[in-house]
Amino acid sequence: PNIGTGGGRDYLSAFPGSREMLTRYDVVFLGDVGVGRGQLSAKDAELIKGLVEQQGSGLVFMPGRRGNHLSLMDSALKELMPVELDDARPTGVGLQNESVLTLSNRGRGHLLTRFDADEMVNDQIWKMLPGFYWSTGVIKSRPGSEVLAVHSELRNQWGRIPLLAIRSAGRGKVLFMGTDSAWRWRRGVEDKFHYRFWSQVARWMAHKRHLAEKEGIRLSYTPETPKVGDRVFLQATVLDEAGFPLENGEVKGEITWPSGDGDQLDSDQLEITEDEGGWGVYSAEFLPQEGGPIEITISAP
């Protein structure tokens, strides 16, 4: 807000303000942007929430020094924020001395914070990364969130201040990065750590949307490696011929698994229902009858 617009081949002149336009995006990054004039609208916030919860996209909160992110707490996105923000410090906290992100026990073994397979080496890398002087005002993490890294110097009655935290939201994932200085990780090593971190974030967030994808249908399933007796939940995002989310469509599903003798195939129809919200999401569930490769076919005639 209040700065000149950019340009370029992939530049967006305006926010994709409809389900049809937004559904193509795997990850949304929100910097020093809130809800207000020249920024997001309340409807935009609701669309982002729907994209994450219904279609399994990712959302990254990256607050800045203007404090615009606090206005998001009066929007639909409040429920998705992994931390409780400190509204008494709208412009964040600045220190004279450099601080660093300190990995939590959860962060030491998480994919997003892994620069080396050896946890001890990885921990040393994080300690040596160029630090920061400014951070978002945060009180604590919210219930259901996982804290991957905390402020090396600041703490309150709740403990160390969480600056890197994640949480699930419906079918999607959300990440909060409470410092704007990750770009400094390029110092002396170019994009070795900076690029790797953000590429890991993007892949982690977009993973479920691309488990199976063909001809306007994306299929995701939980758990990804089911065992006999585990109930499997399927979500199919279906687009119409124009590439928009299919509403009130006829979506069919069939599950095929090998029979006990391994030669003859047996199949059943899946009972598929459309989820509310108009995001083109259709759901089904089943119990695996036996081990082995299972084939799932989803079609929208």
PLM region descriptions:
Residues 1-301:
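N-linked glycosylation sequons
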